[in-house]
From Swiss-Prot:
Names of required cofactors: FAD
Residues that hold NAD(+) according to the record: 277-291
Main localization (coarse): cytoplasm
Record's keyword annotation contains Chloroplast: no
Function: NAD-binding protein involved in the addition of a carboxymethylaminomethyl (cmnm) group at the wobble position (U34) of certain tRNAs, forming tRNA-cmnm(5)s(2)U34.
GO molecular function: flavin adenine dinucleotide binding
Annotated source species: Finegoldia magna (strain ATCC 29328 / DSM 20472 / WAL 2508)
Protein name listed in UniProt: tRNA uridine 5-carboxymethylaminomethyl modification enzyme MnmG
Binding site for FAD: G16, A17, G18, H19, A20, G21, V128, S183, Q374
Gene3D superfamilies found in the cross-reference section: FAD/NAD(P)-binding domain (3.50.50.60), GidA associated domain, C-terminal subdomain (1.10.150.570), tRNA uridine 5-carboxymethylaminomethyl modification enzyme MnmG/GidA (1.10.10.1800)
Subunit structure: Homodimer. Heterotetramer of two MnmE and two MnmG subunits.
Subcellular locations according to the entry: Cytoplasm
Family according to the record: Belongs to the MnmG family.
SUPFAM superfamilies: FAD/NAD(P)-binding domain
C-alpha cells in the first residue's frame, strides 16, 4: 500500500453490514459506544442474497429472541414482509415457528435507514484489509484505501465474502454474493494473527421471470389471514396487508435424468469444491445423489419483492453450468417456458473454527476481537443476527468494564446456537433447528420477551417502552391465570349440554375453569360461555394463557431439569489454566479441554471426547482445590 493515513478513532469497528454486522453495530452504538460499521458496498447492507424470507422452524425463535433483546430484525421485517405464515400449527406450541417472505429491496432500504439514523453509528463503504493487534489487544484496522482507524474492539461479520469463489460448472471466479467484490487480504491478515481458516460452501438457486411461469399447474400457498408480528413491540397491533402468494410445484423424472447426465460437470462432483456444503439445504445435485429412489422433489416459487419480477426458486440450488441449469429448470412442472434472470451458483468462502471463541464470541486469546455470523461456520440470516447482537453486547460490556452477557442453553435458542458452535464446533454450515434445543417447551418463540427483555433492559439495550410492555404482558397473564383458578364450573344440566355441544365429557363434580381449559378438546376461547366475567384479551395474550394452563405440568418438569442444568453451568472452571495438572483425565480430554477452554463444568460435559468419568475427575479436583 503506497500511502497510509490516520482517520478518527472508534470504540468499535464492525466489519461487514449483513445481518450479524447490523445487529452488532446497533447494539454497541445504542449502548453508548462510538461505532463504525464498514461494508465493501453500501448496496449490500442487510442483503438477502439467498432466500427472500426471515424465520422458519427454529429460526423464527432466533428472530423473536433478537427482538426481545432490543435488536432490529423483527421490527424491519414487520414493516417489509409480503407474506406471513405460522409453521407447525398442527403440533405443540414449542415448535410453532413464524416464517415470512421479505421484500428484499425494502428490507435493505429500511435497515440501512435505521443504521444511518442511529446515534453513535457511522456507516462507511470500505474494504477492511488488515487488523493490527499489539500485546493481544486490538489496536486498529486498515482499509484498502489506506485509512487506518484506531479502535478498541473489532467485530468480524464478513459473511461469505472472505476469499469468496463463485462456481457455475467449469466457470469459476472470485466474488462475494450477488456479484459483490470478495475480500482476500483480510483472510491473510487473520492467518498472520495465527487464526486458522477453512472452507465452507453454500449455494443459491436461479431467479426467474414471474411472467414466464404457469401457475395453474402449481399449488397456491397463501399467507395467514391472522398476521402475527415478529416484534413484541407490535403485539396487539394490526400489521396486516395484502399478501403475495407463493407456489408449490415439483421436479420430474426428466429433471433427474438431466442432472445425472451432467453430474461430472458439477464442481461438487468434479473435485473443484474444497468447501463443505450445508446438510440441511442441499443442492438439487445432492438431492439426486442422496435420494436416488425419488423421482420428484418439491420446488417452492417465492416472490422477491413488489418492485421486481424476480422469483426465487427454493429447492433447486445448483452449481451446474448455466446451459444445463436452463435445460433442467424447463423440466420442472409449470416451468416449460421459464426465462432466467439470474443463474444459480455455489459460493465457497473462508471461515474459522468457532471453538477458538468464548461464549461471548470473543477470541480466546486476542482481547476484544469478536466474530459473528457465517465466519463462525453458521448458515442463515437469523443465526447471524443472533450472534451479532451477542457479539455487540459483549464488545460493549468489555469496553465499559461490565460483566459478560452470556445466554446458556436453558435461556434461549441463541444460547444453544452459540454453545453448539464454541463447544462442539461444526464441520458443515450450522443451521438452527428446534430439535437442537433440550428445553423447547420453556424456550418458545411467544415468550422470548418474558425470558430475555428484563436482562436486556438491565444492561441498557432494551428500551423502557419494550420493558414496560413485557411487564404488562406478564402481569396480565398471571392475573388471568389466577382469575381462572377462582372460577368454579358446576355440573348443571345447562353446563353439561354446553360441554356435549363442544364434544367434551359431562361434569360429575365442580371444577375450576382453569382445569376445564386443560381438557385436550377445549381451548381458552371455547370456554368463554362458562365465564361471565371474562374481558376481551388480545389474541396473543389468550394464546399465552392457554399454553401456560395446558402445559403447566410439562413446564414444571422442564424447569426442574433446568435447575439441575444450571448447577453444572454455575461451576466455573476458570481456576484451571492447564488441564495437564488434573491427574486422572484421559489424554483426549486434556487436549480438548486445553483447546476449547470451557467456562463451566456444564460446558466441559458437552465437549466431544470428554467422558462422564472425566467430568467426575474434574468435580473431585475442584472440591479438593476449594479445601
Amino acid at each position: 500500500m503506497d500511502r497510509l493515513y490516520y482517520e478518527n478513532p472508534y470504540d468499535v469497528v464492525v466489519v461487514g453490514a449483513g445481518h450479524a454486522g447490523c445487529e452488532a453495530a446497533l447494539a454497541t452504538a445504542r449502548l453508548g459506544l462510538k461505532t463504525a460499521i464498514m461494508s465493501i458496498s453500501l448496496d449490500s447492507v442487510a442483503d438477502l442474497p439467498c432466500n427472500p424470507n426471515i424465520g422458519g422452524t427454529g429460526k423464527g425463535h432466533l428472530v423473536k429472541e433478537v427482538d426481545a433483546l432490543g435488536g432490529e430484525m423483527g421490527l424491519v421485517i414487520d414493516k417489509t414482509y409480503i407474506q406471513s405464515r405460522m409453521l407447525n400449527t398442527s403440533k405443540g406450541p414449542a415448535v410453532h415457528s413464524l416464517r415470512v417472505q421479505a421484500d428484499k429491496r425494502k428490507y435493505h432500504d429500511e435497515m440501512k435507514s435505521v443504521l444511518e439514523n442511529t446515534e453513535n453509528l457511522d456507516l462507511i463503504e470500505a474494504e477492511v484489509v488488515d487488523i493490527e493487534v499489539e500485546d493481544n489487544k486490538i489496536k486498529s484496522i486498515t482499509t484498502a484505501q489506506g485509512a487506518i482507524f484506531p479502535t478498541r474492539a473489532v467485530i468480524l461479520a464478513t459473511g461469505t465474502y472472505l476469499k469468496g469463489l463463485v462456481m457455475m460448472g467449469e466457470y469459476t471466479y472470485e466474488s462475494g454474493p450477488h456479484g459483490m467484490k470478495s475480500s482476500k487480504k483480510l483472510s491473510y491478515s487473520l492467518k498472520n494473527l495465527g487464526i486458522e481458516l477453512r472452507r465452507f460452501k453454500t449455494g443459491t438457486p436461479a431467479r426467474v421471470h414471474r411472467d414466464s411461469l404457469n401457475y395453474e399447474v402449481m399449488t397456491v400457498q397463501p399467507g395467514d389471514d391472522d398476521v402475527i408480528p415478529f416484534s413484541f413491540l407490535n403485539d396487539g397491533k394490526d400489521i396486516s396487508k395484502k399478501q403475495e402468494h407463493c407456489y408449490l410445484t415439483y421436479t420430474t423424472l426428466k429433471t433427474k435424468q438431466i442432472i445425472e447426465d451432467n453430474l461430472e460437470r458439477s464442481p461438487m462432483y468434479a473435485g473443484i469444491v474444497k468447501g463443505v456444503g450445508p446438510r440441511y439445504c442441499p443442492s438439487i445435485e445432492d438431492k439426486i445423489v442422496r435420494f436416488p429412489d425419488r423421482d420428484e422433489h418439491q420446488v417452492f416459487v417465492e416472490p422477491e419483492g413488489l418492485s421486481t419480477k424476480e422469483m426465487y426458486i427454493q429447492g433447486v440450488s445448483s452449481t451446474l453450468p448455466e446451459e444445463v441449469q436452463k435445460e433442467m429448470y424447463k423440466t420442472i412442472i409449470g416451468f416449460e417456458n421459464v426465462r432466467f434472470m439470474r443463474s444459480a451458483y455455489g459460493i465457497e468462502y473462508d471461515c474459522i473454527d468457532p471453538t477458538i471463541l468464548k461464549r461471548t464470541l470473543e477470541h480466546l486469546e486476542i482481547n476484544n476481537l469478536f466474530f459473528a455470523g457465517q465466519i463462525n461456520g453458521s448458515s442463515g440470516y437469523e443465526e447471524a443476527a443472533g450472534q451479532g447482537i451477542i457479539a455487540g453486547i459483549n464488545a460493549a460490556m468489555n469496553l465499559l468494564g461490565k460483566e459478560p452477557f452470556v445466554l446458556d442453553r436453558s435461556d434461549a435458542y441463541i444460547g444453544v446456537l452459540i454453545d453448539d458452535l464454541v463447544t462442539k464446533g461444526t464441520n458443515e454450515p450450522y443451521r438452527m433447528m428446534t430439535s437442537r434445543c433440550e428445553y423447547r417447551l420453556t424456550l418458545r418463540q411467544d415468550n422470548a420477551d418474558l425470558r430475555l427483555t428484563e436482562r436486556a433492559h438491565e444492561i441498557g439495550l432494551a428500551t423502557d417502552e419494550r420493558y414496560e410492555k413485557m411487564l404488562h404482558k406478564k402481569k396480565t397473564i398471571d392475573e388471568e391465570i389466577e382469575r381462572l383458578k377462582s372460577i368454579m364450573v358446576t355440573p348443571t344440566e345447562e353446563t353439561n349440554e354446553k360441554l356435549r355441544n363442544l364434544g367434551s365429557s359431562e361434569l360429575k363434580t365442580g371444577i375450576t375453569l382453569l382445569d376445564l381449559i386443560k381438557r385436550p378438546e377445549l381451548t381458552y376461547d371455547k370456554t368463554e360461555e362458562f365465564d361471565a366475567e371474562r374481558t376481551e384479551l388480545p389474541r396473543y395474550l389468550r394464546l399465552q394463557v392457554e399454553t401456560h394452563i395446558k402445559y403447566e405440568g410439562y413446564i414444571a418438569k422442564q424447569m426442574s431439569q433446568i435447575k439441575q442444568f444450571k448447577k453444572l453451568e454455575n461451576r466455573k472452571l476458570d481456576m484451571i489454566e492447564d488441564y495437564k495438572e488434573v491427574m486422572g483425565l484421559s489424554n483426549e480430554a486434556v487436549q480438548k479441554l486445553n483447546d476449547i477452554k470451557p467456562e463451566s463444568l456444564g460446558q466441559a460435559s458437552r465437549i466431544s471426547g470428554v467422558s462422564p468419568s472425566d467430568i467426575n475427575v474434574l468435580l473431585i479436583y475442584m472440591e479438593t482445590r476449594k479445601k
